[in-house]
Amino acid sequence: MTILYAVIACGLLSVLYAIWATRSVLASDQGNARMQEISAAIREGAQAYLARQYTTIALVGVVVLLLAWWLLSITAAIGFLIGAVLSGAAGFIGMHVSVRANVRTAQAASNSLAAGLDIAFKSGAITGMLVAGLALLGVSIYYLILTGPMGLQPNDRIVIDSLVALGFGASLISIFARLGGGIFTKGADVGGDLVGKVEAGIPEDDPRNPATIADNVGDNVGDCAGMAADLFETYAVTVVATMVLGAIFFGGTAVLGAAMLYPLAICGACILTSIVGTFFVKLGANGSIMGALYKGLIVTGLLSIVGLAVATSVCFGWGEIGTVAGMVITGKNLFICGLIGLAVTGLIVVITEYYTGTNKRPVNSIAQASVTGHGTNVIQGLAVSLESTALPAIVIVGGIISTYQLAGLYGTAIAVTTMLGLAGMIVALDAFGPVTDNAGGIAEMAGLPKEVRHSTDALDAVGNTTKAVTKGYAIGSAGLGALVLFAAYSNDLKFFAANGDKYPYFQGMGEISFDLSNPYVVAGLIFGGLIPYLFGGIAMTAVGRAAGAIVEEVRKQFREDPGIMAGTSKPNYARAVDLLTKAAIREMIIPSLLPVLAPLVVYFGVLLISGSKASAFAALGASLLGVIVNGLFVAISMTSGGGAWDNAKKSFEDGFTDKDGVKHLKGSEAHKASVTGDTVGDPYKDTAGPAVNPAIKITNIVALLLLAVLAHG
């Protein structure tokens, strides 16, 4: 219990850090009256959208809560509620700060680049520490209540089902927040760009564009609240799945409690290292913003090695722990698995930055292709998006095989848990992005001097890269996390099948095989494989419809009031925000339910056709693998490709020199071609790609809960 109390203390410290950082950010100067007016409009729009989104989610959540109570138990229903409320709170509070930090960053940037970086990063760190702290507190305190006052054994089915339900609560919030926020932000961005930049020829963030405020609102609801919910879910479900595997593999042994506490201890230690790492983010003498951010990330990673060693030593020691599936597990090997998790994180960050960073080969190749036209830009962008999947996949494969050889599936789970231990710092890097983007918009709309805009542009360019890098991390950890969930599903299934006397539904079922000679397994793989593509297609269509509505709205305002373009009258910003809010909420419902219902359709569909429970469970398991494999490639391809398109466009804003030495500036034909590519890449990287993440995990969580419901019944 001492370890558990220490873990809870780490979670509380994370929340205290967020409170301190919030006070520090809000105490900063808000700039002049015009800047505050623009910031207030962004803030009101973001809060109005989020309030409506959470109201919609709450209606769905109440139904799921009652179903969890009826089909499982009151403890499962409470677990679901904890996961949903804390996930929503992390995103809402983080966004509450980011929509106030934007104007303060713009004002600080007018003093110095270092001051602007300090406020923007501190604002991002608030969201990051809330995600890690609240997720850890939710799981650890609920586990403490279940195994303490309620007197349940750590591997009791009630404990396991309640923790899985907590993960499902986080998942439900995540998929709605990711998809709804993505539709809103890219509907505004694409629609505003098509009319503003392409038709009217006005720059980005020009106050004459009626979609400008909606675009800035979208940055917050998509990249701040959406990413927070996504990584909260990955964090929570991975820790829960690792605890479930610990309960299955070490049940009935002396190390059962330690095996379930170990992932919590790792996350607690990594929260401390992330907090320390934030204090190292300072602009150096060379003025490199990315260098300052990486300094904090590297310090966090190095200190996490020490934290991992302490967690291993306290929970297990370094010697033999036990034998799982004929494999001897040692504390030393688990520590090495954790190191591999940290290495995978570092490699994915480096690879994603290579594919999306300015002045790197992939981005330069898209910029060069823009010189010959719109079509060649799109072709090269698609080529980069496909190519960008190879290296991350090889790294993930290496991580899976090496950790499995060292400590079996539990070792793989520990590697993923260690990856997610860094979530506090990684989310801080991501939430830094929308703050700097908004700061640039405020500087432009408020007519601040060019020097200020130069500073905010430098921060925004780095913010674009950090957003892409964190998406790569989120996808890699989601794919590996889903693999851990699949391991929990297959081992849970074995457990129920072997204990048919206790669980009558599974009686006489025998061993379930995922053999590819079984046609139901192949059918399950194909069905699972189609889900990420169908889901991505629906998401892209939704953005297209939302963008179309914004195009019509902006054209209408320009047509009805010529004074807008002349600068003598103001556009109606609120009308565009309201239109997008309604569109995003309407469009997110059906695709969000797709990954929730898919596992149920597979299981009951195959059961109805074959009449065999074993075949139905095999098909369901295969469909989970299909979702994981295809989802991983679809998500990496979309996010890296979209990020590369975006930064290729940014290359022209500073002036791009092609292979013949000709310089192409903003407004040139090559720049216009790059805007077309960015328009395609925007929903790729900010809507469909990131939303595939929670879709991968939620299918696996639903499958785990289905087993629990059938066993309970």
From Swiss-Prot:
Binding site for substrate: 186, 685
CC annotations in GO: plasma membrane
Compartments (UniProt record): Cell inner membrane
Predominant cellular place of this UniProt entry's protein: membrane
Cofactor dependence: Mg(2+)
This protein's record includes keyword Transmembrane helix: yes
Site annotation Determinant of potassium independence: residues: 467
Membrane spanning stretches: 1-21, 50-72, 83-103, 126-146, 164-184, 239-259, 261-281, 296-316, 334-354, 381-401, 409-429, 468-488, 520-540, 589-609, 616-636, 691-711
InterPro entries, alphabetized: PPase-energised_H-pump
One MF term in the entry's GO annotations: inorganic diphosphate phosphatase activity
Keyword annotations from UniProtKB, A to Z: Calcium, Cell inner membrane, Cell membrane, Hydrogen ion transport, Ion transport, Magnesium, Membrane, Metal-binding, Translocase, Transmembrane, Transmembrane helix, Transport
Keyword NADP tagged: no
Positions marked as site (Important for ion transport): 178, 223, 230, 686, 697
Catalytic activity from the UniProt record: diphosphate + H2O + H(+)(in) = 2 phosphate + 2 H(+)(out)
Positions contributing to Ca(2+) binding: 646, 678, 682
Residues at which Mg(2+) 2 binds: 216, 219, 437
Annotated membrane topology: Multi-pass membrane protein
Known EC number: 7.1.3.1
HAMAP family in UniProt: PPase_energized_pump
Role noted for this protein: Proton pump that utilizes the energy of pyrophosphate hydrolysis as the driving force for proton movement across the membrane. Generates a proton motive force.
Subunit structure: Homodimer.
Family that this chain belongs to: Belongs to the H(+)-translocating pyrophosphatase (TC 3.A.10) family. K(+)-insensitive subfamily.
Record's protein name: K(+)-insensitive pyrophosphate-energized proton pump
Gene source species: Mesorhizobium japonicum (strain LMG 29417 / CECT 9101 / MAFF 303099) (Mesorhizobium loti (strain MAFF 303099))
Gene name of this polypeptide: hppA
